[in-house]
Design a protein with these regions (language model features):
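N-terminal secretory signal peptides
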Residues: 1-34
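C-terminal capping/lid region of NAD(P)-dependent oxidoreductase domains
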Residues: 49-72, 322-323, 331, 335, ...
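Short N-terminal strand-loop motif that marks the start
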Residues: 3-5, 31-133, 202, 206-210, ...
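Glycine-rich beta-strand-centered segment in the early N-terminal region that forms part
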Residues: 92-107, 116-167, 172, 219-221
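NAD(P)H dinucleotide-binding glycine-rich loop of Rossmann-like/cofactor-binding domains
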Residues: 114, 160-256
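C-terminal substrate-binding/catalytic core of Rossmann-like NAD(P)-dependent dehydrogenases/reductases
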Residues: 3, 321, 335, 347, ...
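Mid-domain Rossmann-like dinucleotide-binding core that forms the NAD(H)/NADP(H) cofactor-binding site
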Residues: 46, 206, 214, 219-306, ...
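Glycine-rich cofactor phosphate-binding loops and adjacent beta1-alpha1 units
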Residues: 245-249, 272, 293-403
Length: 465
């Protein structure tokens, strides 16, 4: 949702109910098998037939599941209590607004390590992960956005287009994300125990059942492994430079963390023609990758930790202090720094097996990211896993005119942005393949997430046959 986001339900505590409380009649359809929307659709089709326009009406109708999918066998990683294992499951039938997706690839997000590797309890058997990519196998009778056979991204951020947030231009905060409890089981274990999906997606499975609001059809020949990144890490980093903090040509950009999200932000800033891209990262191979993908400077936060903020401010000083000649900061100016800052490092959920930073809680990087944002600049917060609380000087917080953006996938507008990111990958402006360093099958999920937790791999993708 890596360094992703707590609002995705990534910790197993925010799984959500698959029913739609907006429509009482739809809820009743669970018992009658017929919903109000289905009846309205049928009435419209009948009217078109009487008018001699049946063919046209049918052409506009969505693809629907011809038969029940209940009982279909599949495998998934299931977390129950403090353990995770591959289980044989039986699918329940899908609802009128749900989409059945055969998973082909799923992104390995750092925040999911807590669920997969078992350092917290999950009360209800849960299929982990908050994104995935695959092919539509069946759709409910009221689904319009996707059709059977479509290649679809099941994104960590939904977009309904009709809720308060979507109508006010904030689809990254779509009310489907948090206000509904999508905790209805989508399958059963051998003993009949119901299984739910983390974040209503559950991407570590051969099948996903998602509301259409989470599904984005992508019309491209790009590999599934690359497209899976657009449901989480790659999209979050790109959006942080193009939506919340719209990086301007020639501007100074500072990025804390060179994991999958931070490196996506590097590529996004480069594609926006940033003048300077400074990356702070303790792991040597990740600093090297940042330079390869477009960073102009990389810094180890362990070097001169106390002077890191001042060093970055000096790098962003500009060619002159003459205010009447376009100078940024006159003598004694207190709010110097970068135009755009992205915090994508977070805290350590597990002890890394590589170089460590100066503060495993992640709070130091969070504070430093705020301190190196210039007055009037933009700070986007993408990472999760920080441990503890942080405070800021009241006067500076109120008067420095910094803009702080909480980064639900960097502010991505899924239906608008995913297709344009596809185009950027197709023409080489973004290198999605560069951040994939390992792929694993379903049987290798636990081993793959251990590598993610150790930070010995950069980007891990899980593939399904």
């Amino acid at each position: 949702m890596s360094e992703s986001h707590e609002r995705h339900g990534i910790d197993g505590a925010a799984e959500r109910d698959a029913s739609d409380p907006r429509d009482e009649a739809d809820t009743q359809a669970n018992h009658t098998g017929v919903s109000r929307r289905s009846m309205l659709t049928a009435s419209a089709l009948a009217a078109a037939t009487l008018a001699g326009r049946a063919a046209q009406a049918q052409q506009r109708a969505p693809s629907v599941a011809a038969d029940s999918v209940a009982g279909r066998p599949f495998r998934a990683l299931v977390r129950s209590g403090s353990t995770a294992s591959i289980e044989d499951l039986r699918l329940r039938d899908i609802g009128p607004r749900q989409v059945l997706v055969r998973t082909t690839a799923s992104c390995g997000c750092y925040t999911i390590t807590r669920t997969v590797l078992g350092n917290r309890n999950v009360d209800t058997p849960t299929i982990p992960n908050h994104s995935g990519f695959g092919v539509v196998e069946a759709v409910g009778a009221e689904v319009h956005r996707v059709r059977t056979g479509d290649r679809v991204l099941v994104c960590g951020t939904p977009e309904c287009g009709q809720c308060y947030q979507c109508l006010h231009g904030n689809p990254e905060a779509c009310n489907y994300l948090n206000s509904q409890l999508f905790n209805a089981p989508i399958a059963d274990m051998a003993d009949g125990t119901g299984v739910i999906q983390q974040a209503a997606i559950g991407g570590l499975s051969e099948l996903m059942v998602a509301l259409e609001e989470y599904c984005i059809p992508l019309f491209t020949d790009l590999p599934d492994e690359q497209l899976a990144l657009l449901g989480d890490t790659l999209a979050a980093g790109l959006a942080s430079t193009m939506t919340y903090g719209r990086v301007e040509g020639g501007s100074d950009v500072v990025i804390f963390g060179a994991g999958p999200i931070g490196l996506a932000a590097v590529q996004g800033a480069r594609s926006q023609s940033a003048g300077q891209i400074i990356v702070i990262e303790p792991v040597a191979y990740r600093r090297d990758k940042a330079l390869e993908l477009g960073a102009t400077t990389v810094l180890d936060p362990n070097d001169d930790t106390d002077s890191l903020v001042q060093r970055i401010r000096e790098m962003c000083y500009g060619p002159t202090d003459r205010l009447d000649a376009g100078g940024r900061y006159g003598p004694g100016y207190r709010y110097g720094g970068a135009d755009f800052v992205i915090e994508a490092s977070g805290g350590d959920l597990f002890p890394p097996a590589v170089e460590t930073g100066p503060d495993p809680t992640g709070l130091l990087a969070l504070r430093q990211s705020w301190e190196v944002t210039r007055g009037g600049g933009h700070l986007t917060l993408l990472a999760a896993g920080q441990q503890g609380e942080i405070s800021f000087p009241t006067a500076q917080f109120c008067l420095s005119t910094r803009s702080i953006h909480g980064g639900q996938m960097g502010g991505m507008h899924p239906m608008r942005d995913a297709p344009r990111y596809v185009k950027m990958i197709e023409r080489g402006a973004i290198d999605a393949a560069a951040v994939i360093t390992a792929t694993y099958p379903l049987e290798g999920v636990v081993a793959g997430f251990q590598r993610v937790a150790d930070r010995t791999e950069l980007g891990v993708v899980f593939t399904f046959g």
